[in-house]
């Protein structure tokens, strides 16, 4: 078997950035940031939503996402000007060179 194929499994400190709630859980998350929690130093991972802030677990109907998809879309494309509609042009059938169009069949 190959050696060193699996990532290192260790205790990682997860911090909910919206509530400040901290918890330790086993993970393979890789980071250089560390933080002291309950007297021990752990690698730290900042999360935007956890069980302490998600509406399903808290029972509240507060808006968790500070900037949603629609807001991001409007922010990105608010300065874009609308394009003028293109005028319709007639479409001609293009045949390869040397080929002639078959004559139309007569209806009976």
From Swiss-Prot:
Any one GO biological process: translation
Pfam families per UniProt: Ribosomal_L31
GO molecular function: structural constituent of ribosome
Positions with biased composition (Basic residues): 97-108
Entry GO CC: ribonucleoprotein complex; ribosome
Gene3D superfamilies, sorted: Ribosomal protein L31 (4.10.830.30)
SUPFAM superfamilies, sorted: L28p-like (SSF143800)
InterPro entries the UniProt entry points to: Ribosomal_bL28/bL31-like_sf (IPR034704), Ribosomal_bL31 (IPR002150), Ribosomal_bL31_B (IPR027493), Ribosomal_bL31_sf (IPR042105)
Record keyword Ribonucleoprotein present: yes
Keywords for the protein's UniProt record, in alphabetical order: Ribonucleoprotein, Ribosomal protein
Stored PROSITE patterns: RIBOSOMAL_L31
Ranges where the record places region Disordered: 85-108
Family: Belongs to the bacterial ribosomal protein bL31 family. Type B subfamily.
NCBIfam families: L31, PRK01678.1
Complex formation: Part of the 50S ribosomal subunit.
Protein name: Large ribosomal subunit protein bL31B
Record organism: Chlamydia muridarum (strain MoPn / Nigg)
Source organism phylogeny: Bacteria, Pseudomonadati, Chlamydiota, Chlamydiia, Chlamydiales
UniProt gene name: rpmE2
């Amino acid at each position: 078997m190959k050696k060193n194929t699996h990532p290192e499994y260790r205790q990682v400190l997860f911090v909910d950035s919206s509530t400040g709630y901290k918890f330790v859980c086993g993970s393979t998350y890789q980071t250089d940031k560390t933080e002291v929690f309950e007297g021990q130093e752990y690698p730290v991972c900042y999360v935007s939503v956890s069980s302490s802030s998600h509406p399903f677990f808290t029972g509240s109907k507060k808006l968790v996402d500070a900037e949603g998809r629609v807001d991001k879309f409007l922010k990105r494309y608010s300065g874009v000007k609308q394009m003028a509609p293109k005028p319709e042009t007639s479409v001609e059938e293009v045949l390869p060179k040397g080929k002639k169009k078959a004559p139309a069949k007569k209806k009976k």
